[in-house]
Design a protein with these regions (language model features):
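Catalytic glycan-binding domains that act on GlcNAc-containing polysaccharides
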Residues: 1-146
Length: 147
């Protein structure tokens, strides 16, 4: 639910045209894709060297434009931050389960975005019944169609 809530917020605040390749490669925006990931995150994840070449930066920006890769990088970022905070790798955080989980989620979201109002918004989205409905109630089997 954390990744869904972060994506929900990031998509609402996305900049017009930032998903276009020429904008991504122009250098006008530092974060890219639905998860708003930057080149520095790839360095933290050891997917790029500390001083990437222009070719490596271009490769990274191309990957940021792929939504599936972008969301995978967000999940890896949260996993990396969890380990840096000393949280167990296999721990699934649930804000409704405990105050400590909610605090850990707030810390992770702050470290992702860096804005003080961000954790409260994300925690709110994680409790949003409509967002829960989209994820958990919207799964319906495909109808059988006979022709």
């Amino acid at each position: 639910m954390l990744i869904t809530a972060v994506l929900f917020d990031e998509i609402q605040h996305s900049k017009p045209g930032e998903s276009l390749p020429f904008i991504a490669h122009s250098g006008l925006v530092k974060t890219h894709g639905p998860a708003q990931i930057s080149v520095s995150e790839l360095i933290h994840q050891n997917r790029l060297p500390a001083n990437p070449t222009q070719e490596e930066i271009t490769w990274a920006r191309n990957h940021f434009l792929d939504p599936e890769m972008n969301i995978t990088l967000l999940a890896a970022k949260f996993q990396r931050l969890k380990l840096a905070l000393g949280l167990p790798e296999s721990l699934m955080l649930q804000a409704s389960r405990s105050y400590l989980d909610a605090k850990a989620i707030a810390t992770l979201t702050y470290l992702h975005n860096g804005k003080l109002d961000y954790p409260a918004r994300v925690l709110g989205y994680m409790q949003d019944p409509e967002l829960h409905g989209l994820i958990y109630d919207g799964r319906q089997p495909n109808p059988v169609i006979t022709v």
